[in-house]
Amino acid sequence: MKRDLYEVLGVAKDADADEIKKAYRKLARQYHPDVNKEADAEEKFKEVKDAYDILSEPQKRAQYDRFGHQDPNQGFGGGGFDGSGMGGFGDIFDMFFGGNGRRANPNAPRKGSDLQFGLSIDFIDAIFGKETDVEIPKEAECDTCLGSGAKPGSGVDTCKTCSGTGQQEVVANTPFGRIVNRRVCSTCEGKGKVVKEKCSTCRGSGRVKVRRKIHLNIPAGVDDGAQLRVTGEGEPGANGGPPGDLYVVLRVKSHEFFEREGNDIYCEVPLTYAQAALGDEIEVPTVDGRVKLKIPAGTQTETFFRLRGKGVPHLRGNGRGDQHVKVRVITPTKLSDKQKELLRELAELSGEKPGQHGGEDEGFFEKMKRAFRGE
């Protein structure tokens, strides 16, 4: 049984779009197969993505809130009635007026289906953007039969089963009375036509599998889960209809040093207790290269410093976010006799005795050690 989508993302049913996006980004980062090596990570990542794809779209979310996981177009089951083929107002007219509803023309031009392709990019490429070529597996119109599915020189006949409508009518008796239900014709698969001899290249489908090279311009500032739309690079249309679109979903790899929250970047750098106590000027890595950062005397562990304009470029508009640098004071694990002696002298100069604990008489040395540990 499928889990509730709000439960999957860990948000309330009245959560707004920002809350849903924030929850998705957190879970996507946690379960991304490039980061999480657990056996079920990929399955959880897909579950999170599927939940976000629905809840992030207002129309899909409204439909889910109303019908849940059930297909809203699904009819009644059992009783000799199969509602799987029902859809649209034409079927309702069929039910009450004996099949006079408007039918869709199976030979009318139809737009091709959209394609989705996942692309992993490096953290730095997401910050500054990148131009790249990717090969997309897709279907294309068969060059031999030009999409008809028929062997060149052979004809195409109107389907005798459905008389070219592409649909079969099935009569069912239900507790509600006699119902006429339409479903896709099993002979022509909804096309309304049947080829006399199938094309040997595509075996009658009118399509062949290809790998198409697509040039992508990834803009600076994209985040994990962003989609790039490439118009006309989806599946081919039917009966002369336009092709669908290609949606490239970006998966940003994690970085060993930087973390990102919105347009801001976070990192952590170590300090010795001497640097923290006396102050210093250190070099800090940024996505632009190393910069100088002044550490004032008396800096405590887990203090944050801001490097303005060193974050992520705004995807829409000018400017960049900031980089936040958290310093962590490192307590030495091994001290030489000379170092221990100097620390004891420092404690004595402060009027305290090392080794004492509690109240105002607590030794300076122990206080300092715990401060360095962040306690």
Swiss-Prot record:
NCBIfam families in UniProt: DnaJ_bact, PRK10767.1, PRK14280.1
Domain J intervals: 4-68
SMART domains reported for this sequence: DnaJ (SM00271)
Keyword Metal-binding among UniProt keywords: yes
SUPFAM superfamilies: Chaperone J-domain, DnaJ/Hsp40 cysteine-rich domain, HSP40/DnaJ peptide-binding domain
Annotated gene: dnaJ
Quaternary assembly: Homodimer.
This protein's name: Chaperone protein DnaJ
Lineage: Bacteria, Bacillati, Bacillota, Bacilli, Bacillales
One GO MF term attached to the UniProt entry: unfolded protein binding
Repeat positions for CXXCXGXG motif: 142-149, 159-166, 185-192, 199-206
Species: Brevibacillus brevis (strain 47 / JCM 6285 / NBRC 100599)
Annotated region (Disordered), positions in chain: 349-375
GO process annotations (BP): chaperone cofactor-dependent protein refolding; DNA replication; protein refolding; response to heat
